[in-house]
Amino acid sequence: GNGIDENIINNYSTEAATVFVVPVGNQGNTDTHTEGIIEKVGDIKDIEIRVGEKQKNLPIIIWINKPNRVMLSIISPTGEIIDNMEAKNTNNNRIKFLYEKTEMIVNFTSPELSTGDSHIFIRAYNLKAGIWKFRLTGEYIVDGNYYAWIPQRELIDDETKFLNPVKYTTITLPSTTNGAISVGYYNQNNNSVVSESGNGYTRNGSIKPDIVAGGSNALVTTPGGTTSVMTGSSVAGAVVAGCCAL
């Protein structure tokens, strides 16, 4: 990864006796990520998002690997379409849907400064429930890889999800950095895989997580000197951090 947090970790991780341990998150089975391949110029891929009744605002991020280029169309639940927006540098392109009364602000960045890839950032306001389609049409295609994310499950309505989710590439920032030990978790009580734990690879193909540790129904200490039972990659991250300290 090349984000601000990731670069900071990369820089400081080269110092002696310094180890960064980052949990990969618990988004493996939350339907908040999808990805796919546009085979050739003119091919169409629909990214479908079911928006829940309580979901009024939603950010959507789409990455297109360089040097591929696409056009974006957005189709509302009633069938209204904003057609063939080109993925070139535009800031705060405002579009409105007549029937839904929904407004979206679309930012294209191509190439994005740190990666050279195309980045589409969509902010949707006053969303109406139903299936929204974000249609990608190949304009210039080499390998055609694209990736899309919505916020983590805990931050959005339970009914809001991708209709064709992918469990891979679901590790959270900044665990994508090469300068940290990225930690997933498994069920140490029966030695089984846990579907909630974030899955690699990273978007640029780095192998993550680096390691997994037990993180299911673990007895942990809490403020005030009491104990509690917790589950998640943060528990596993704490175990690995302790091992590094030793």
Task: Provide a role label for each language-model segment.
Residues 1-2, 23-24, 137-139:
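Short acidic, glycine-rich surface-loop motifs adjacent to enzyme active sites
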